[in-house]
C-alpha cells in the first residue's frame, strides 16, 4: 500500500484487527450508506454515521422500537422501573434499544431479554 505513512498503515491494520475481533464476538456495524441501516434513523438530522449492533439489524425496520435509558448510578427504584417498563413494552411487541451503559440501561435490556424481547 504505497502512499501511506507507517502510522497510517498501523491505524489501518488496527482497524482491521478490531473489525475481525468484533465479528468473532458477533458485533457488526453499518453506516448510513448501507442498505441495512435502520430507516427510522435515516430521517433524523445528524443521525449516527456508524452504528454497532449484535443480532439481526433488520428487526429495526420491521418492528416498533423505543429507547429506554437512564442514570448509570440509578436507585433500586430506577432499576426496577427500567426493568418493568422494558418488560411491559416487550410484551406489547416493541423492541428495546439503548447504549448498554451500566445502570438503568442494563436493567432495561435485561427486562426485554428476560421476556423474549428482540
Outline where the language-model segments fall.
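Glycine-rich beta-alpha loop segments
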Residues: 30, 36-118
Amino acid at each position: 500500500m504505497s502512499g501511506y505513512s507507517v502510522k497510517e498503515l498501523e491505524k489501518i491494520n488496527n482497524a482491521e484487527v478490531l473489525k475481525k475481533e468484533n465479528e468473532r464476538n458477533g458485533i457488526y456495524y453499518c453506516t448510513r450508506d448501507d442498505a441495512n441501516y435502520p430507516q427510522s434513523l435515516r430521517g433524523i438530522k445528524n443521525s449516527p454515521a456508524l452504528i454497532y449492533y449484535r443480532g439481526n439489524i433488520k428487526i429495526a425496520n420491521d418492528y416498533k422500537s423505543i429507547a429506554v435509558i437512564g442514570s448509570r448510578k440509578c436507585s433500586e427504584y430506577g432499576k426496577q422501573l427500567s426493568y418493568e417498563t422494558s418488560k411491559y413494552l416487550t410484551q406489547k411487541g416493541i423492541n428495546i434499544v439503548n447504549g448498554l451503559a451500566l445502570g438503568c440501561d442494563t436493567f432495561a435490556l435485561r427486562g426485554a431479554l428476560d421476556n423474549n424481547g428482540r
